[in-house]
Amino acid sequence: MPFLIQYFSLLLLSGIFIAAGGCGVHDPDYYNRRGVSMDSQGRIDDAIGEYKKALRLEPYNRESHYNLAVAYHKKGLYKEAIEEYKTVLELYPDDPETLYNLGAIYARSNMQDAAIFAWEKAVELKPDFTEAHYVLGFTYAQKKQFDEAIKEYNKVLEKKPDDAITHNNLGVAYTEKGLLDAAIDELRKSVKINPSMAMTRKNLEFAYRKKGMEEEADNEFKIYEELTKKGNQAQ
């Protein structure tokens, strides 16, 4: 069984908003800016308090809702984060970053179909959204929808042709479909870009064996063992 590599753990796109405006205590942007400053210092709880103050003054302030959602997301308060992201989308439906982050929470909660729905809408709004294409590919592969995974990984490689992990995962998808020549080609590209990823060596060994190329498979397995001893799983 070949191995997928997930190279960002459902990346949280912060994209914190700092609104321009007045500086008085009755100005929601004042509290929003204070929250952003506290957030940048790692004072997430204090930042949440400031964003809530901004929203008490202006309940439909999109920037404060988004920043509050991100703060909740960082703290792992996913239910609260979902509510805030949904509020942002009510105010601004065509926000691909919010859709991406919402999908990330759904994926963490094993709600893969909901995650895919959010990410598909994100890439519809922003076709060159590489991170969203990658997680779509990864999630489709997990669901064994390899044609869809291949499509998404190729879109990533259009923007990031030297991404070793995406080449690896595309190779895995081709292997699962029995397209061994294409799989070997992608895995070799991955190895050329980053020779030290042990899992890619293991995947290449697997593809070679399925192809009947035992000598090449044995060589990759030896390299795989050497790399795992050094701790190079997905570097």
What do these predicted regions represent?
Residues S40-K53, K75-T87, D94-E97, R108-K121, ...:
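Structural signature of tandem alpha-helical TPR/SEL1-like repeats
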Residues L57, L91, L125, K159, ...:
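Structural marker of alpha-solenoid helical repeat scaffolds
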Residues D27-E63, N67-L77:
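Alpha-helical segment of the N-proximal tetratricopeptide repeat
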